[in-house]
């Protein structure tokens, strides 16, 4: 089940809900770790994945390091970064996972700020290598995840389309209508 919305920059943004086989509904933490990572890979062993995490999956810098970050609300990160170090993945009492974020020595420098595992947005290594784009992967074992997805289906319009065109020297020239759907499908 999925929905695709268009954000203000005009690019498509997908929310995808994948249903697992019933035998996978209550996994062990190790099962979650096989699918989702919230750690910086070892650059010596997984250099390509390390570079993709650096490019696409690091949150911030924000907090005291950058109070002007867009995620900052009342001097706190609205996405709750940096997360806490956790030596193993656990599922809390509400059924939400707290991903493994060990305090290893792997770091990434972004805008002159050293970031560690506490700043990694959860990802799936296979999807990140294949699509080379930001893909926030979350383990959901709740009915609320279906409600979350339907919120986006029924969310109404919140988009802008802009186009830069050469200026018309003749102000009386008839402008041709713009077929935005065709432009999107042709790109």
In which residue ranges do the predicted regions lie?
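Extended, structured polyanion-binding interfaces
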Residues: 1-187
């Amino acid at each position: 089940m999925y929905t695709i919305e268009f954000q203000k920059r005009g690019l498509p943004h997908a929310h995808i809900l994948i249903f697992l086989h019933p035998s996978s509904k209550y996994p062990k933490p190790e099962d979650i770790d096989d699918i989702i990572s919230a750690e910086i890979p070892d650059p010596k062993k997984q250099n390509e994945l390390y570079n993709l995490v650096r490019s696409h999956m690091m949150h911030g810098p924000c907090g005291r390091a950058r109070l002007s970050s867009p995620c900052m609300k009342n001097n706190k990160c609205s996405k709750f970064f940096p997360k806490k170090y956790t030596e193993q993945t656990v599922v809390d009492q509400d059924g939400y996972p707290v991903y493994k974020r060990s305090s290893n020595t792997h770091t990434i420098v972004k805008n002159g700020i050293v970031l560690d595992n506490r700043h990694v947005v959860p990802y799936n290594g296979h999807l990140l290598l294949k699509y080379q784009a930001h893909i926030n992967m979350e383990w959901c074992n709740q009915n609320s995840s279906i409600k979350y997805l339907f919120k986006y289906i029924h969310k109404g319009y919140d988009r802008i389309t802009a186009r830069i065109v050469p200026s018309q020297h003749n102000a009386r020239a008839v402008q041709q209508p713009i077929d935005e759907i065709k432009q999107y499908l042709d790109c």
